[in-house]
Amino acid sequence: MTYVATSPPDIRLVGLTKHYGEVVAVAGIDLEVEPGEFFTLLGPSGSGKTTTLRMIAGFEDPSGGTIELAGEEVSGVPPYDRAVNTVFQDYALFPHMTVGDNVAYGLRVAKVDKSERARRRDEALEMVRLPGYAERKPGELSGGQRQRVALARAIVNRPKVLLLDEPLGALDLKLREQMQVELKTIQSEVGITFVYVTHDQDEALTMSDRIAVFNDGRIEQVSAPRQLYERPDNEFVAGFVGVSNLIERDGERLTIRPEKIQLLDPAVPVDGLHSERGRVVEVAYAGMVTRYTVALDHGGTLQLVRQNLEGPSAVAAPAQGSEVLVGWRPEHAAAVRGKSTTEEVAS
């Protein structure tokens, strides 16, 4: 999705900083999130992504910098007066209330007319695929259903921005994958800007329009998922987002994804490929694929994956210790600059 700025961004952070004593949790970041984006803050634990989300929500006060929501500076504005809602991993539902009362709670506090509350409650439950659940209690629902109730409660009062703090972290893998698809679909339908925090790279790549990669309180890169994965700016991004190979050739550090590397038949030349010889030092069967680790004759080690296909193959599956020829297209090798922005700042 391409965004053309015709109005102020829904979120603008300028020099945003957060200190806890001498610890720098967020180190002067700049960031803009456009209306209607599904924007993800991705990073390891302690990288500053959740602290940034909490400052946007108003739960934490910045140590420096500014936060704008839809063009208005909101420093000092309490959370309940900001045009944002937050969905947490623990759902934060009222167990004694019905699903319908949970969803409509914010509307009741805002003194919305009873008939309008009921209409918007039912509309929100329909959006999250839970029609007919209004009279149930949260304790009668599965984890995925409770998460959808929390989402319905967050969108029912039509916030400008929805903040989601690792909302799928407590779900099992299959349900989490299902909810990723549903969340993206719901976001597209309601048109609300989503800012999503996660440490899960697959989750970020699956759902996001753009991703900001956090590390040590700084932003390493902001890109669309494909650009982030295929053209990482530095070694940290290459290593954190998926699996990557890093080798040095002709004075450059190159990153190559395992799925871009091919096992070649030495007797059959392939035009347009850069090829190198090496030896298989590890073989790991992983169901649909087999993972190989190859020590290259010219230095460096590569990981590559090969689908476990039935039937004849141009190249026999190599055993550990085998001498092999591997190759990749030059455009699939991306040059990276340095290890991280933190290293650049320190130097």
Feature map (PLM): residue ranges:
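Conserved ABC transporter NBD signature motif
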Residues: G65-E73
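Non-catalytic connector elements of ABC transporters
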Residues: S244, R253-S347
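Helix-to-loop junction immediately C-terminal to a conserved catalytic motif
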Residues: A57
